[in-house]
Amino acid sequence: GLFDIIKKVASVIGGL
């Protein structure tokens, strides 16, 4: 769902 995408993006940003 949309929230899963948001969590994925947040994980990528957190990985930076």
From Swiss-Prot:
Transmembrane segments: none annotated. InterPro entries: Aurein_antimicrobial_peptide. Expressed by the dorsal and submental skin glands. The modification Leucine amide is found at L16. Pfam families: Antimicrobial20 (PF08256). The keyword Repeat does not apply. One of its GO terms (cellular component) is extracellular region. It comes from Ranoidea citropa. It comes from the Eukaryota. This is Citropin-1.3. GO terms for biological process: defense response to bacterium. Bacteriostatic action for Gram-positive bacteria. It is found in: Secreted.
